[in-house]
Amino acid sequence: MKTSSALLLLAVFFPLMLLGQHDQHANHTVADVEPQPLLAQAMRLQEALSFSGNALQAADAAKLKALQRGPLSKETVARIQAILDPYCLNVVHINPEGRVKVDRGAAKAVLVQGGWTAFLVKVYNEAGITAKFEATSPNALKPYHSPSFEHRVKKEHELTEGQVANRFLDIQIYAGRPLQPNLSGLKLEYAVVQIYSKDAGKREAEIAYNAGQGSQDIGFRNSTHILFDAKPAVKVNFDVKDDDGTATMASFLITDGQEHASGKFKGIYPLPSRRVAAFDEYPDFFFQPQIYRKSGEHVTLPPGKYKVTYSRGPEYVPQIKEIVVPEGVASINVGFQLKRWIQLAKLGWYSADHHIHAAGCSHYDSPTEGVDPKDMFRQVLGEDLNMAANLAWGPSWYHQKTFFTAKDHPLSGRKNVMRNDVEVSGFPSSHAGHIVLLRIKEDDYPGTTTIEQWPSWTAPVLSWAKSQGGVVGYAHSGWGLEPMEATNKLPNYVTPKMDGIGANEYIVTVTDGLIDFFSAGDTPAPCELNMYYHTLNCGFKTRLSGETDFPCITDARVGQARSYFKPKNAMDYDGYVEALQLGRSYVSDGKSHIMDFKVDGLEAGTGESEVALKSPGNVKVTARIAAYLPEKQDSIGAKIAKAPITEKPYWDIERSRAGQSRTVRAELIFNGAPVDTIEVQADGKLTDISFSPKISKSGWLAVRIYPSSHSNPVFVKINNQPIAEKQSAEWCLAALEQCWKMKEPNIRAEERNAAANAYEKARKVYRELIATGSK
């Protein structure tokens, strides 16, 4: 089995079999070297090459092994070089002053498109230095500029299409076990250089080496120009079938399982560091390991064996398929059958993420200012999002706003809809909290032509957006809401810091009816929910909505946190934002679900979400629950479960798992505190649950699987008495005072009076609630 695997892996990285002598290489045999350490290093080198799937030819490996059995002599040194030199792309000479000079070696300059090729580098180290040995190339520079946070790309960051095309390589010195990143100090040793080519065909590259700062020789002699011949890879055509047999888009993570030079995503195909969405056949993102392909599309892979992990968002069960790409063929076909554990759309619930971006954060701002929104739509399809709001914001604002139409993106269809809307972030009001504006008709604030002219606090922007039919809320709510004294208790009564960009000024604007939804799912749950619970306890009826803030808080995938909504009428963008306003939705990581939440038969999001009781008494609470956890917790799940809730992923069902079981707890919440719990098996099956709590005062009820999913509230009024928890109102008033202290210095002088009046108006609201709650 080991022999056949080794042969197969040779097919992945066949360069070490390309041994024809380079026409112009000189004789670089080095004498006067101790044979014992050189032979020991050669044996480690052979072992490392085997680990990386690049073993020496069998005959050469046998010759090396034979040298171990013979006497150690000058002949041993010569024979080692005779065996290894034909594999060398370059010969590096470090003179006694530590200067590096590079010559061409004997190996043929043959690469493979879309794959790694390994060569040896012979190092004649006269200086005996032990610095880190590195390989570089201008052809391996980043083919993009990232991260991006500028409103417009800076001139010095601009890359032309020609520059991008010339950056087709990745190059690394392999320093994994049993090798090491530093030179040993021995007069002669060998290193392994691994080169990846994005392209096929003839390509010239400049390859350079150094052994620490300032080691380059005069006249740029530490580099060589090499004309490579990159052999074409195999076209692997994908046939992707959904659970019902229809063709679809899905997510694919392709790995070879081999040892590569250290670095992010080095064993992943296509190599992320060479991906440029603007110019590639398919717009794969360089900061993600996965790619997205629909049936009929393809990926190019060099011959070899691969592991493909494929799925389509959290409603699907991830699967693994091993594929073999043979040599000597132009293309092959591979089929993938997706497997769901649940299909919420069939139950009347549709997935949505109101916060994704085509620019900023992990995206590049050159060669283009972010990606085209149509590239984001592939991500939406591949993660099975029915609805997505692609938000233009500060970074690359002036370019990205050109995609704003106040209509659905043209690629939208009956099952998947995307619209370009706005996040007011990177604007003068951002210090008070970033805000999401959905379904707006106009994206320029009245009287402005530049970002700098927008208001410096959030209320005017919210009011303007709502005046044009927009549905609005604060983004990444928990940022800035960390308690002054650390606690994860829910609810808690510690004043928040109010020093961030989340739902900070929400404490003001919620009192004026300016907020439709409160974002959840992408910041620590205690910070998000503590603010939310306290404002509900003051009688405000803001609804929860799930968001990811891709690719900022996470660049893993869109829809990592999401809403599931039940449209009142059509499943379209209007139906979606209406469902958010009404609370016909719940927040979820997609791995647990709280459907059809009702109190005395009234479903959340209907009839003002309010149940009226004449006097204290019991109510019947029902919901339909579904959750999915693997039967056995894997290492990734265990890591998530043990991580502090202040570390990502903030919302994940692994945090909800009861010990090592497959059980999660559905909690009934009244006014923010759990009052009952039911254990549910996370086996993917639908489970109907019910509670019968006694309600002794006006308040609100919700169901949560913490921190994986959370329903919207249903409000219960007894004898039409208001919901007014004194302690919550006191907390809100303290938070308001802290917010003014932190935000007032950054509000423009000419706007400060209006802001001060709004804060004072909110103070009066909370004081009245405190007085009401005291009765």
Residues of each region from the PLM?
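Bacterial N-terminal signal peptides
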Residues: 7-17
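Mature N-terminal segment immediately following signal peptide/propeptide cleavage
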Residues: 33-60, 251, 350-355
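C-terminal functional module detector
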Residues: 151-153, 163, 168, 172-177, ...
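A short, Gly/Thr-enriched small/hydrophobic beta-strand-prone motif that recurs across taxa
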Residues: 230-244
